[in-house]
Amino acid sequence: MSRRFLACVLGIAVSLLPLALASKPVYPDASLRALSWRLIGPFRGGRVIAVTGVTQQPSTFYAGGADGGIWKTTDAGHDWQNVSDCCLKVGAVGALAVAPSDPNIIYAGTGESFTRGDMTTGDGIWKSADAGKTWTHAGLDATRVIAKIVIDPHNPAHVYAAALGHVFGPNPERGVFETTDGGTTWRRILYVDNNTGAVDLIMAPDNPEVLYAAMWQIERKPWHLESGGPGSGLYKSSDGGAHWTDLSHESGMPSGPFGKIGIAASAAAPHRVYALIEAHGGGVFRSDDDGTTWQRMYHKANITQRAFYFSRLYADAHDANHLYAPQAAGLMISTDGGKTFKSRYAQGGDHHVMWINPEHPEMMIVGNDGGATISLDGGISWSRLDNQPLAQFYHVAVDDQFPFHLYGAQQDGATFEVTSRDTTGYGIDPDAWHMVAQWEDGYAVPMPGQPWITYTGGGVAGLLERYDSHTHQKAFLGPWPEDATGHPAAELKYRFQWVFPVMISQHAPHAIYLGYQCVMKSADGGMSWQEISPDLTRNDKSKQQLSGGPITIDATSVEYYDTVFALAESPLAKGLLWAGTDDGKVWLTRDDGKHWHDVTPPGLPAWATVSTIEASHFKTGTAWLAARRYRQDDYAPYLYVTHDYGQHWQKIVHGLPDDESSFVIRQDTRDPALLFAGTLRGIYASFNGGDDWQPLQLNLPHTAVRDIAVQARASALAIATHGRGFWVLDDIEPLRELSNAALQANAFLMTPQTAWLTDGQQDPDAARYHSGLNPPNGVSVFYLLRQAPDDATPLSLSFTDSRGKLLARYSSNAAKSSGMRLDVAKPGLNRFVWDMRYHADVTLQPDEQVVATGPRVVPGTYQVTLSIDDQHMTRTFNIDKDPRNPSTPADLEARYLLLRDIQDDQIKIATTLQHIDVLRSRLAKLQSSASDVASRERITRWLSELDQISAALEEPASDAYLVGLQQPSGIQDRLGTVTFAAGESLLRPATGDIQVWKALKAEFEVQSAKLQGIEEEIRVDK
């Protein structure tokens, strides 16, 4: 479809549009400026992998999210504020340290050292010199993962960093690094080999020249984790890192190979060192002679389990026998020097890191898979987690309800459904989130037409959970519900990934598809299944073995490989299915699985994970795919398009950074050339079918965007981030209407999307109350300007109904506005939100001007006209009723007319009061100049009567807030109560509303008659 034809369909002036899709360029940032991402939430925590505190400020702490940036609290965890969105270009923060000698200086290391199969890497070290207000990059970007930072207690420019390295492949930027100039330059001072990095690092509490470093040989692939090898070991330096000694073979140490190691020391015993060592015969080891000899103190599995995911130790600075080991079972604590450990509760689960105030050891912070939690009493009580929007979602689905809902599974949380706007309040409160499944991974898909029924995939048995939110019934379905824990993928009847795809057919709602090594289909809502494809993977048995070795086996479905990882169904052709595998294959069937064709793009590297396939909404043979290979140390984006059912593919990555892996690609549902792509660090848009890409980041934090969904009716974009929860971009119509001609015009008005007459408001500060942000309740009007208007050539927006009656006018010149001043008039894209209210074109006293704002209009067709100079542009839009509202058009019309009548009376009262003020002033002057007593007495009586009329019309102003409890309210105030009663709901006004209005109207007429009588006396007296 040509852009010219699409413009006609949308009612846009053809002369202002480019001639063809291909002519759409990369647009300047100002052309997107007025768009804004809206945080939905949840505020229920998320994975935190780095924590620290400020010794001198006991209530100040910092936390680093797994892909959520840096957060700060100054009230011991009651509230958290992000301090890194201003500056950091990555979200994974794995190390934090505050300079002991200057609490304003903070170093942050990026990348995750708790090497989950889904971990996110970083870009080195960042530094703040103003307590987190601003940040600058401080080097080591090639390391990708910084596990620990240690700062010289006397010199904040002297810093050591433990660099784990690439994790997914060998690289030389590993080991321990040192800077003496605050990060301007770095020197590698400990290096083993390209497969081994530094995972922990401590400084002796009594001597900054003494360092202990844990080196870890680690490699991850999509199909395997290898934790440990000959490169792993424990090292010591006694001269600030100039020379190192390998302690791994000292007396009492376990035999190798070693895996991950955690280290701790206490100022209370300067010669004592603790080490938690992953090894055959590993456990907690202690040296009381500076590392010369060692003794194993503890070896039970509650400390040594899943070493790659835990293995940190912390010692109390005041009590060397008091030791902490964050673990899955809780915060493991020893009070006898490591001989025994007991679990202590802390908020959250899967605890990873902690910081203990060295001067007040009862004050501590713990980071875990639920967030950051603080204790000020030694772990007796802990701060809340539900104030941190750090959720890691894998996917997002939307339904067709109003408002539409979002669905997704949160890592280390559960699977949730949430509304995109809360029409009962000012934000999306925590009680708007509803759990629909217990799984922390995978897809959550609502049934078309029955969104109260969801299907969610997850678990280690490839289960599919069906949940009915009406009846609260759940059913666990699946082709082969056998627990796979501890088994290699090669032994399974069905291989499935941790995040296996779940797809409900758009053509047959009870048809469900799953991706295992083959495609599974159920025609009866999951009760029975059949294989509709052969094994579509490469089926390399060497990549289907147990993971975790050579020391600790870790067999979960996270590393299961050779599986179908992406499914897509054509919305245009029943039976046309696409399948992509995690080992780099793409398949197509046009007969619902009877025959499959290998349509793998020739340029797609082997073993790439095909994470998303998008079937076109406009052409059956067109599809896009997004693939990634960052877990093989290849961070390039892989996006492809085919227009002939996969016979030919074109790579489409121009404009994307070459180090941002691609997760998802989606097509707009109305503009065939408009595409969206989610990457490792953000989101991009293409306006020409993928030929060129540009950032659509706007105010979105830099974090991985794992999935994108276009909600057609709302013209909204919903995204799942892997560290900052759900976000929505409301009203993407401006993206559809952008064009060269629109940008070159002096002004260009875009077509407003349908607005909804509903309740609920937007509080821009909702996040302060741990709530998601509502959209503005009104009509969003977008317009482009080449330059800002001035008072000589003001810009105005006028709103009229279908009969041409003016409802409101806003102008950049306040004197020409019937409502508030139009102050959104800058070069580039602007957004104005009309509140859908009638605004009377009257000028009243400031304290009375509020009555000029009338009721919200009724559903119907409206126009907005933009005027500047001699140019006038008009667009038509609709306002629809909330479909949940039972009111009829006649009900809403009756409500509107009543409220307009009340408003008319309120305006009359306001103008009457203004007139009385003028009359008072005149009488006061006459009284001062009157020569006879009789005249002065008459004027005094008139002034008194005017005061009585004023008091009857409106309660006198007072500095006392509760003065209204001491005197009757006026007619104006009582009319306000009726306005509130009739206007708060979108229903037919109650009989009482009408009766009270009529009674008050009659009272006003009585007072008006009294005023007329006084004025007649004054006229006669003259």
Residue spans for each PLM region:
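Bacterial N-terminal signal peptides
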Residues: 7-18
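Beta-propeller blade termini and top-face loops
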Residues: 23-769, 776-786
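Glycine-centered tight-turn motifs at strand-turn-strand junctions
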Residues: 91, 806-853
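Beta-strand-rich binding/interaction modules
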Residues: 466-467, 781-785, 790-810, 861-865
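Low-complexity, Pro/Ser/Thr- and charge-rich linker/hinge segments at domain boundaries
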Residues: 734-760, 874-910
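Contiguous beta-strand segments within globular domains
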Residues: 758-796, 800, 829-833, 892, ...
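Short acidic/polar inter-strand loop motif in beta-rich domains
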Residues: 840-844, 867-875
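Mature extracytoplasmic or organellar-lumen-exposed domains after removal of signal/transit peptides
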Residues: 868, 877, 910-1022
